[in-house]
């Protein structure tokens, strides 16, 4: 076992992922997740050296309480593992345009993360709790905490990509612009794709699709992001589990003026009751629309809208590649496992030279990576993401 390990914390809006990782080889000695935080059915699951554990947390447990449980009940299962920690890495959802790369956390960094809360009101406060607790639990590593931003990879976007057609002073004075999300994942699969395609990352041109409960797509030109689908917040873009993605903004005024809905009701509808959940009326789980695509109208309707939106973005982003599009990459829980989503999406893109290989597509699931198109097709690849490894490696590099 390496004596240089990194603790990675990823505090979501209602979840908390944690892992102790060897940043050199990616081995996870401990990993787990607390789910349904702030809800009656809060629970936590973890794997320590290959052994699986799970337990219920107190009803309504917060991030703070979940971190206390982890410190008291999980870390103490193997104290010698903690003695090998050299640094702590934190996934931070939004850093505005303050950060173009990962940074060691100090008071100024914390202040800027706090200043970004209006752009990620559910996530950044949870991220800050993780930082405060880590410094408290591991005082000897207080100066070895690193922030890795989901927005940083997208800071290479040119002005024509990140500006909205709104009064310019809204950007200058209020920071209203496109920021994107899932940048850590888009960065990882970009570099992995360059290896698989045997091409220097600074010459690779890709369209990367991170498809999970949240979803985003990025145009990668010469290894850098030049456009991405999520905007000021993670609500814009693709159809997602419970988020609408792109809509006509006037729908909001219609719901407010004509339907009499409050601003909070509209916000909840767009973020919690739309997307796959809204279209099916049953569930936000993509496996439902996969399993019932043939037999149920709601599933068929939903997957058709989902894949139409995704294909439309891929087609649009392909026009940004001045030279050649090397490949389309699928990652994230849906991107890595939903063969039917990949098939239906690529079937709409034959004009771009994509031809699905049914056997390869079906085989590339459940952690298996690889090419899913025919030999004479433009390549499409499945690459399982590994955000924790990126965070661990950035953390180790900055604190070495």
Swiss-Prot record:
User: Which family is it part of?
Assistant: Belongs to the acetokinase family.
Q: Which domain of life is it from?
A: Bacteria
Site feature: Transition state stabilizer: 182, 243
Q: Which cofactor does it need?
A: Mg(2+); Mn(2+)
Q: Name one GO molecular function term.
A: magnesium ion binding
In terms of NCBIfam families, this protein maps to: ackA
**Where does this protein act, in terms of pathway?**
Metabolic intermediate biosynthesis; acetyl-CoA biosynthesis; acetyl-CoA from acetate: step 1/2
Question: Function, please?
Answer: Catalyzes the formation of acetyl phosphate from acetate and ATP. Can also catalyze the reverse reaction.
**What are its E.C. numbers?**
2.7.2.1
**Identification of the protein by name:** Acetate kinase
Chief subcellular site? cytoplasm
Quaternary organization: Homodimer.
